[in-house]
Amino acid sequence: MSLAVEYISDKTPCQRCSTKDAVLLARRENYCGDCFIRFIRGKQRRSMQDEAYKVKYKTVENPHRVLLALSGGSSSLVLLDAVASLLQEQAGQHGGRQGFALTVVNVDERERLKLDKSFQDIISELKSRYLPVDIDFVSLDYDMYVDGRLLHHIKVASDFSSYSIPLNKGTNINDILKGCNSKSSEEDLLSIILNELLLKTAITHQCGTLLYGHSMTRLADEVLALTIKGRGSTIHSSVLDHTEEISGQTINVKYPLRDVLMGEIEAYCKLAKLDSVVMSSTIPDPVINKNKTVRGLTAQYFRQLDATGYSSTASTVVRTAAKLAAPTVGTKSGTCKVCGVEIRQDPHQWLRRITVAENEKVENNSEESGEIGADKKEDVGEQIDLCYGCTVTIGDAPSFRWPLSDKDIIAEYTLDSDED
């Protein structure tokens, strides 16, 4: 039992270089600051050893472009620092050439999370820190996901069948979230929107790779949260490098920091002096557990494990989840119209089997009894496919709206990029 990182105050030599004093103990080894930073960067570089990321001396018409998702949190900033340092080394060793082009994208959450700084506030510092590397910075908004032409009202009936009715009026993301029954449902839907926005941005900017800065602790948190929310079929793609096929294009999705614990991320931030650009929420964590979201509870669980010396639990969770594969049971019967996941087993049939229906009233005339428990299809709309997770998330929300479209169709929207 040990903490992920323990700082050293006495004079102890670094076990890597033997020339400097160690500043911390991690994974049973003493590191000086430079060696620890090099150790963490090595994790990222091992995950990006393909030829696509190496320097080419021949003229390439369309150089490989990488999209890096930057939330402004410590993990994504550590990933940016590691990737940018790789590009700096390539430029220094190969006459200014880079192995790939880098685009950094941020989805604006300053208002929702009450962040202490905005993405625009840190761009200039990031640019100066990573000179002479040329990095494109792109800012997105959740409302870019909402296409009024595709907007539908979605209703889950008492028998768990799902229906949609086209809407003529526009809406924004805040209106959509108001239709949720809980903070956990809001959080779940925002994660769907975020992933779709990033994939669409990768296509728009002709990026062949999408990088997430999730640490091992964050991925373990995600595994538990997905299980609780009934989205177990997506666990394999949430912890492992994989590909996404969209509009005939292939996007390589990678998690370069999947072997790095959160305690190690925080130590890297401190040693690399990244704390000044970390975007932190000013909203205090709810004290009462019932006011926390599912992800808030799972994150709290792993923070407590880290604090009590059981940080290796996250490694066990992620390694176990990595053994999972894409669902193969049954044949594909449809695609969820909200999250885009393949449906192989009817979730509505399962929900009907485990749910006890309310008792019907005995005193009814024939006309009333014919309407009990039955939804009039002409009032409900067209039947659509929803996965188990989305059926539970939407639940009995009285007024839930969502833009329905096939996952591989890219809606038109505008991206704000920093070209300076």
Curated annotation (Swiss-Prot):
The keyword Cytoplasm applies. It holds the Pfam family CTU2. GO terms for molecular function: nucleotidyltransferase activity; sulfurtransferase activity; tRNA binding. Pathway: tRNA modification; 5-methoxycarbonylmethyl-2-thiouridine-tRNA biosynthesis. InterPro entries: CTU2, Rossmann-like_a/b/a_fold. GO terms for cellular component: cytosol. Its main location: cytoplasm. GO terms for biological process: protein urmylation; tRNA thio-modification; tRNA wobble position uridine thiolation; tRNA wobble uridine modification. It is found in: Cytoplasm. Keywords: Cytoplasm, tRNA processing. Signal peptide: none annotated. Belongs to the CTU2/NCS2 family. Plays a central role in 2-thiolation of mcm(5)S(2)U at tRNA wobble positions of tRNA(Lys), tRNA(Glu) and tRNA(Gln). May act by forming a heterodimer with NCS6 that ligates sulfur from thiocarboxylated URM1 onto the uridine of tRNAs at wobble position. Prior mcm(5) tRNA modification by the elongator complex is required for 2-thiolation. May also be involved in protein urmylation. This is Cytoplasmic tRNA 2-thiolation protein 2. It comes from Meyerozyma guilliermondii (strain ATCC 6260 / CBS 566 / DSM 6381 / JCM 1539 / NBRC 10279 / NRRL Y-324) (Yeast).
